């Protein structure tokens, strides 16, 4: 899994259970990566070192252990509304904590689809039903 993390531009995690961190050393994430831990587990070590952190709602994340130490926080809705630029440089490492609000889930999937649909035949992407409670 470390090799996957090291090479990824976008990493989306939808796990429902995590004991601790998924990746002990946050330095494996290259500049420019965006991590979207939908259920907000396993990436807390990135909270204080990533360049920007977004949440779908401040009230959902304001009690996070490291909330006061986020370098640059805003709500993802501000980006979608055009009031926040979002990524300010191609080197920024970004966390987007998505608590699972359905509207944001649909928007994320829509944007990802737009980015990949002209390069890949989406029907050819293999998906496997998870067999464990924990998966990436």
Residue spans of the language-model regions?
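Short helix-capping and hinge/turn segments at secondary-structure transitions, especially at repeat
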Residues: 10-20
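Glycine/threonine-rich flexible loop motifs
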Residues: 19-27
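Short acidic low-complexity segments
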Residues: 1-8, 23
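Redox-cofactor binding/interface segments in oxidoreductases and associated redox assembly factors
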Residues: 12-13, 36-37, 55
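Adenosine-phosphate binding glycine-rich loop
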Residues: 42, 46-136
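Short glycine-/small-residue-rich Rossmann-like dinucleotide-binding loops
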Residues: 15-17, 39-40, 58
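Short, well-ordered alpha-helix to beta-strand connector turns
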Residues: 8, 32-33, 49-52
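A short, aliphatic-rich alpha-helical micro-motif
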Residues: 4-6, 28-29, 47-48
């Amino acid at each position: 899994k470390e090799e996957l993390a090291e090479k990824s531009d976008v990493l989306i995690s939808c796990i429902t259970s995590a004991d601790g961190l998924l990746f002990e050393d946050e330095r494996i994430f290259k500049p420019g990566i965006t991590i979207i831990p939908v259920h907000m587990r396993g990436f807390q070590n990135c909270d204080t070192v990533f360049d920007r952190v977004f949440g779908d709602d401040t009230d959902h994340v304001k009690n996070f252990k490291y909330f006061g130490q986020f370098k640059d926080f805003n709500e993802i809705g501000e980006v979608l509304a055009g009031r926040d630029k979002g990524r300010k440089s191609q080197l920024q490492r970004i966390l987007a904590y998505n608590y699972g609000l359905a509207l944001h889930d649909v928007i994320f999937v829509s944007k990802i689809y737009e980015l990949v649909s002209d390069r890949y035949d989406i029907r050819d992407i293999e998906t496997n039903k998870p067999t464990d409670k924990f998966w990436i």
